[in-house]
Amino acid sequence: MDIRMHKFSDKVPEPTLRRLPWYLSNVKLMKEQGETYVSSTQISKQINVDASQIAKDLSYVNISGRTRVGYEIDALIEVLERFLGFTKMHKAFLFGVGSLGGALLRDSGLHHFGLEIVGAFDINPGLVGKEINGIPIYHSDEFEIKMKSCDVNIGVLTVPINIAQEITDKMIAGGIKAVWNFTPFRIRVPENIVVQNLSLIHI
């Protein structure tokens, strides 16, 4: 992903790196609900990760909570965003403009992760050439051409399961360095490629 997440990969276990964005999105949601402090137990109830594991994961980002109170929510958000590199926006392409892909284009919530979708790809002639929320939809065959003219290294995967690996391979061959996978299929990627396996509940 050419962002800090990749930079810290030598120091932080990969499973931890994959979980940190979940924590960030849930903490932001709690802030919107009026919370000023959040505990690892509260986060655990939202994402089904053991509270002790969450506390261990957060120890890597140099923030400590208060006994029986938890973490100051604004400070935790700031630390996680800075650690993950989400303080700046990163451009992304979306692959698969079905119901899920369309929903993400209309109101993705991905900006919480520092992602800005600047283009989408599909093969449906009824979609190609149109825009959703100001985001253009291109034919999948145009991907490599668009990669040459856009500063994009992140791909958001929302295609049907049966072509998830095929499209992932095409994305990586075209220069994508990180994949945000919203399909149930666990894609296989080279070691130097970052993958986030997500669903709408995470955003």
Write out the residue ranges for each language-model feature.
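Glycine-rich Rossmann-fold phosphate-binding loop(s) that bind the pyrophosphate
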Residues: V97
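ADP-ribose/adenylate-binding Rossmann-like module
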Residues: K170-I193
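Glycine-rich, highly charged phosphate/nucleotide-binding loops
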Residues: I135-E144
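Rossmann-like NAD(P)-binding element
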Residues: I145-D169
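Conserved small/polar residues in nucleotide/adenosyl-binding loops
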Residues: I201-I203
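NAD(P)-binding Rossmann-fold cofactor-contacting core
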Residues: F113-N133
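HTH-adjacent hinge/linker in prokaryotic transcriptional regulators
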Residues: Y37, T41, Q46-M89
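Extreme N-terminal segment that seeds HTH/winged-HTH DNA-binding domains in transcriptional regulators
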Residues: M1-T36
